[in-house]
């Protein structure tokens, strides 16, 4: 007969990141501190997707907020021991400008666009949208990559970057700090225009260690 006793409270170690993939953790962190969650959540803010990957691969983290493509690669590398648990971040990418007029994807032709997230979802999303609009990334549009979202935000504010692909919450930060920085394009809308019903632009997901879930299924489901 199933027990009605609640699952024992355990500590779940989570690797999150600055930017959209970690943004959804803020309320969880607060609720955990207040003691109002089913489990105790120990959230570490990793400096990059690679750092979060390292934490979940080594067992330092049980759960990691990762770019969706990174989670897919990790699933294959670990022979399925790191699995996708949930999608937690849909499209939050925007083209922002500082002193450039951009009203459509076509307006990016011949321009230099700055981005972060090389090798992650932003790169694949931008390349797909450009290609589907008849432009070859690197040929028709020059793309320069910054190390992280914070560096890119600083570049658009200083005017070093005139056009940038930036995620929330950094978009709100830069447009609030400088009214000359404008949101030119919503890349979720641009993705939908070319992909139709075939796919949805997802940015981030929660990946979990399979062995952790198997050992703590009740607590994880909570």
Name these PLM-found stretches.
Residues 3-146, 155-158, 162-168, 178-186:
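Short, glycine-/small- and polar/acidic-enriched structural segments
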Residues 69-70, 144, 150-222:
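Pocket-lining segment of extracytoplasmic ligand-binding domains
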């Amino acid at each position: 007969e199933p027990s009605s006793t609640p699952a024992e409270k355990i500590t779940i170690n989570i690797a999150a990141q600055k930017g959209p993939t970690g943004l959804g953790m803020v309320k969880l962190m607060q609720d955990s501190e207040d003691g109002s969650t089913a489990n105790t959540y120990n959230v570490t803010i990793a400096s990059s997707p690679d750092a979060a990957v390292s934490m979940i691969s080594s067992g330092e983290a049980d759960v990691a907020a990762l770019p969706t493509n990174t989670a897919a690669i990790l699933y294959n590398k670990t022979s399925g021991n790191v699995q996708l648990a949930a999608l937690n971040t849909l499209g939050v990418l925007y083209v922002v400008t500082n002193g450039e007029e951009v009203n459509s994807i076509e307006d990016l032709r011949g321009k230099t666009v700055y981005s972060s997230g090389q090798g992650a979802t932003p790169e694949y999303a931008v390349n797909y949208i450009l290609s589907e609009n008849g432009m070859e990334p690197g040929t028709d549009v020059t793309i320069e990559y910054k190390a992280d979202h914070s560096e890119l935000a600083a570049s658009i504010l200083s005017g070093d970057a005139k056009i940038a692909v930036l995620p929330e919450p950094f978009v709100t930060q830069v447009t609030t700090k400088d009214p000359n920085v404008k949101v030119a394009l919503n890349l979720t809308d641009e993705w939908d225009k070319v992909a139709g019903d075939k796919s949805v632009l997802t940015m981030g997901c929660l990946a979990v260690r399979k062995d952790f879930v198997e050992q703590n299924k009740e607590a994880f489901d909570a």
